[in-house]
A protein has these predicted regions:
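A cross-family phosphate/adenosyl-ligand binding-site feature
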Residues: 1-188
């Protein structure tokens, strides 16, 4: 049975190419149907990284945020039309909002409302470890960023939230989808 995945993308360039590659590989190796949900910021960043066509090539649908509740993805997540919700990569801003109950974008609202249901949520925060991280800019140049203590604290708070599983990296997405599939099988 096809696994139906809602994939929320925020405005992070960090881990974006790796996440797109992981989701693309998932679509090729597992029986999944992916609906991409892009925040307003994600549209710009995905375009900046020249990944729009790649996402469109494997996603069944690509939904673009108009406001926090449009397109209306929340209802489909709550009633089980999707087997799980993956938010990857998640910016420090989105993680902070989720951790503190702010639901003012399509992604943060979808997480807040989905957490009230039985639909599993998997989130990949970009800022999880102390120190510096090296990411790649759209042109391939390296960019070193210092991770703020507040962002790490918000990622930890997110990990403590009921119904949300924090992923350490894009390489954990396939395992999370296998877990989601197993959970769905147990519920049937």
């Amino acid at each position: 049975m096809t696994l139906r995945v809602a994939w929320g993308i925020t405005g992070s360039g960090d881990l974006l190419p790796e996440t797109v590659a992981a989701m693309s590989a998932l679509s090729e190796t597992q029986d999944v149907e992916i609906t991409a949900v892009l925040s307003k910021a994600a549209v710009k960043v995905v375009r900046w990284y020249k990944l729009t066509e790649r996402v469109e090539s494997f996603a069944k649908a690509v939904l673009i945020e108009e406001d926090a509740n449009t397109p209306f993805i929340v209802g489909r997540l709550q009633i089980g039309r999707f087997d799980c919700f993956v938010v990857a990569p998640a910016t420090a801003n989105s993680v902070a909002k989720i951790a503190h109950g702010i639901a003012d974008t399509i992604i943060t609202n979808a997480v807040a409302q989905t957490a009230k249901s039985n639909t599993p949520i998997y989130v990949l925060p970009v800022d999880q470890r102390e120190g510096t991280t090296v990411t790649t800019r759209p042109g391939g140049e390296r960019l070193e960023l210092a991770i703020r203590a507040v962002d790490i604290a918000n990622s930890r708070a997110l990990a403590e939230m009921e119904g949300i599983q924090v992923l350490a990296g894009p390489e954990e997405i396939a395992d999370a989808m296998r877990e989601c599939s197993r959970r769905r099988s147990e519920q049937q």
